[in-house]
């Protein structure tokens, strides 16, 4: 039962989606002329069938198709005036040029997993359009060079599947949830079960094609190293629209091993979590053991780049308290492990190409980083939070290994050496009227954890977007650096200033903007 509950949470985290239509409100009067002029401009370069106005019969289904958090499926949500579905980079260029010319800002959606929905909605009324990358999802693999080009609209599952089809000897270090869009994931860093071996997805990006705020299509050489640095972990949308990415593929062995061991409180879960927080970051980088803590216990979930025999020897030597043995092992290919970890034994390689889900839930998320071990006595207090009304789950990923050998300034993603593990607080509920308890639980446990996590700043992961951390203030039609610094240093630490200076060079008028976009520092 505990294992099935853990799989259920994993599926919710990875695949919450919706297909229902929502009520549409009429655009405000000031938007009328903007809409007409913008549409006229777009239709010069983009086929009309790829444009959706609010008056279009298909608008609601297109907009909601990848809304992963259904609390935003509401007539109160501020939606785009237009949705543009490009099929090539020239369509993206046209959208930006027309948007600049006619005062229409652009937001960008790849997979729709932005936890706060900022890729397809606005917190406040304003005229904007969404460039929905869903139709740009090509994956091209060069097995000999061990590289791939992947469009931003592809899902991680598309990329993983394409890699394995080209070569069983290659893999890529990105997220566990296979329905996540490449564009947003890479833009925020992106990590999964190969984090300790190969770092983040962004660490392994070697080129990109970006449409900048002037509508130019730039590769790495043309954009320059500061711009290229910024798109690899500086958060989506701030520095242009990435049409496609070139990534370095990494070797994986013929067989990998996974295990999932659940321990209840009465089976010593608290002792094991206390031990895990120092053992897991110090293990060889071929082994990643993460934890999903919920209710009365914890699930220890692992990927090992090697055989069951070798893994049992390693666990017996380094973490014997867990009691892991050969009966817990499942050997498989790397690509088979990709669906197995989030979906369990029923997950298949073909599932990686699935872009839909019938699961519908509301959600709230927060994140933390732990730099010092938490005493057992405090873990006992933490676990009491997991049985409170409205409680969710704590997902904990260990660092160390390869990720710790990279300088903090190598990319905007700054979590490298000195981090034991990160925490994602996740809570789901069903039905609009049920929001109060789970939402408050998330904020309350976050407050409770203050003494145990990073400080000055209290760090967070930008791909676990959280508007509780702060939002931009706009003065003179430009986001202010002071307001952005409040939340920005939590995501990026000392890299935030360089991001803001880069923004000031390439988009000083702050065209690409949302509630947590990088402000220009001039």
UniProtKB/Swiss-Prot annotation:
There is a cross-link at residues 113-177 (6-(S-cysteinyl)-8alpha-(pros-histidyl)-FAD (His-Cys)). FAD binds at residues 108-114, 119, 152, 176-177, 181-185, 191, 237, 242, 461-465. One of its GO terms (molecular function) is FAD binding. Disulfide bonds join 41-98, 308-329. Its cofactor is FAD. Belongs to the oxygen-dependent FAD-linked oxidoreductase family. This is Berberine bridge enzyme-like Cyn d 4. It comes from Cynodon dactylon (Bermuda grass).
């Amino acid at each position: 039962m505990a294992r099935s509950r853990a799989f259920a949470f994993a599926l919710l985290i990875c695949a919450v989606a919706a297909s229902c239509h929502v009520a549409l409100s009429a655009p405000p009067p000031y938007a009328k002329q903007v809409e007409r002029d913008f549409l006229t401009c777009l239709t010069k370069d983009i086929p009309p069938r790829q444009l959706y106005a609010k008056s279009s019969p298909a608008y609601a289904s297109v907009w909601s198709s990848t809304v992963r958090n259904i609390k935003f499926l509401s007539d109160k949500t501020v939606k785009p005036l237009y949705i543009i579905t490009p099929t090539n980079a020239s369509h993206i260029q046209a959208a930006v040029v027309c948007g600049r010319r006619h005062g229409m800002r652009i937001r960008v959606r790849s997979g729709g997993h932005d936890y706060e929905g900022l890729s397809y909605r606005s917190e406040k009324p304003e005229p904007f359009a969404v460039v929905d990358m869903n139709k740009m999802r090509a994956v091209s693999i060069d097995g000999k060079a061990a590289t791939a080009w992947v469009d931003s609209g592809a899902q991680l599952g598309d990329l993983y599947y394409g890699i394995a089809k080209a070569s069983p000897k290659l893999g890529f270090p990105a997220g566990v949830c296979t329905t996540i869009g490449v564009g947003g994931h890479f833009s925020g860093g992106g990590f999964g079960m190969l984090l300790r071996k190969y770092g983040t997805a962004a660490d392994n990006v070697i080129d990109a094609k970006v449409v900048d705020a002037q509508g130019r299509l730039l590769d790495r050489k043309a954009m320059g190293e500061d711009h290229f640095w910024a798109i690899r972990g500086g958060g989506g949308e701030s520095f242009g629209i990435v049409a496609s990415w070139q990534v370095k593929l990494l070797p994986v062995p013929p067989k990998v091993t996974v295990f999932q061991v659940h321990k209840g409180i009465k089976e010593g879960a608290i002792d094991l979590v206390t031990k895990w927080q120092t053992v897991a970051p110090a293990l060889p980088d071929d082994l990643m053991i993460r934890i999903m803590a919920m209710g009365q216990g914890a699930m220890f979930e692992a990927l090992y780049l090697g055989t069951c025999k070798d893994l049992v020897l390693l666990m017996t030597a380094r973490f014997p308290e867990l009691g892991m043995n050969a009966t817990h092992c499942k050997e498989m290919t790397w690509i088979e492990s990709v669906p197995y970890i989030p979906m369990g034994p029923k997950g298949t390689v073909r599932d990686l190409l699935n872009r839909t889900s019938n699961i519908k839930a509301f959600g709230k998320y927060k994140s933390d980083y732990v730099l010092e071990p938490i005493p057992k006595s405090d873990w006992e207090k933490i676990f009491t939070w997991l049985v409170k009304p409205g409680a969710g789950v704590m997902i904990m990923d260990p660092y160390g290994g390869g990720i710790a050998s990279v300088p903090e300034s190598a990319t905007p993603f700054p979590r490298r050496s000195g981090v034991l593990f990160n925490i994602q607080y996740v809570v789901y509920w069903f039905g609009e009227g049920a929001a109060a308890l789970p939402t408050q639980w998330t904020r309350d446990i976050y407050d409770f954890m203050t003494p145990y996590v990073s400080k000055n700043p209290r760090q967070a992961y930008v791909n676990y977007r959280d508007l509780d951390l702060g939002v931009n203030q706009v003065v003179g039609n430009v986001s202010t650096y002071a307001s952005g610094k409040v939340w920005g240093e939590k995501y990026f630490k000392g890299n935030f200033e360089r991001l803001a200076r880069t923004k000031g060079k390439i988009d000083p008028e702050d065209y690409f903007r949302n509630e947590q976009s990088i402000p220009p520092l001039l």
